[in-house]
Amino acid sequence: TMALYTQDEIKFLQNFQAIVGLRYIYHETFKNRFTPKLSLMYSPGAFNFRATYSSGFRAPSLEELYYNKEKNGTLSAGNINLKPEKSNYYAINGEFMSRLFSISATAYINNLDNLITSKQVALTETDIANSITKRMEYQNVDKARVKGVDISINSYLGYGISLGGSYSFADAKDTNTDSRLPRSIKHSGSINSNWNKVWGFYTLNVNLA
């Protein structure tokens, strides 16, 4: 596999910026693929607003294609018939940044063709003979869509102390069946705090998450 990537940053008018990128991927099995990226940003004062589009391509890994692994009676099996995964990602983002406070929110849609995922399938006679109780196999999901929102907040409280948190919502579905994708997480979040102290040439940093 070989990949080449080029990117250019273009500033135009006042407070406007564009980032244009193009990746070329050559894979000895799945041949050539171009994946473009375009991001537009408008920055009035302490605010940034972005709109982004990017195309993605992921070839199946060797593990997903060929390897069989067994652990505690569960067999994870490769699949030589896997197709490469392709995606089209669209996002809008807004953020505010100051010395003491920042907040960022992103809404996105990711449309995927041939999403590679692991699904439970029926046991074979060989599995049963080898005391396998569960068989998982890598398969392609023909059409999938992930719609989500990411929010993060950070604040500086003084005396070297900062506090932050994040929340993510992701609705991941097989669009052909309208069923949730296996092992997808719909809600997630985190809270973290940080204390930073500088003594001359030395810095002490303590982080709790």
Question: Could you tell me what each predicted segment is?
Answer:
Residues 2-4, 16, 34, 47, ...:
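Hydrophobic core residues within well-ordered beta-strands of beta-rich domains
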Residues 11-18, 108-111, 132-209:
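Gram-negative outer-membrane beta-barrel transporters
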Residues 4-6, 36-40, 51, 80, ...:
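Membrane-embedded beta-strands of outer-membrane beta-barrel proteins
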Residues 23-32, 80-83:
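Outer-membrane beta-barrel proteins
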Residues 48, 55-112, 122-156, 183-187:
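Outer-membrane beta-barrel signature, preferentially recognizing the C-terminal barrel domain
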Residues 18, 22, 31-48, 188-190:
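Transmembrane beta-barrel strand/turn architecture of Gram-negative outer membrane proteins
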Residues 1, 30-36, 63-68, 75-77, ...:
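Outer-membrane beta-barrel translocator domains and adjoining extracellular loop/strand segments
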Residues 2, 22-28, 44, 53-59, ...:
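Transmembrane beta-strands of outer-membrane beta-barrel pores
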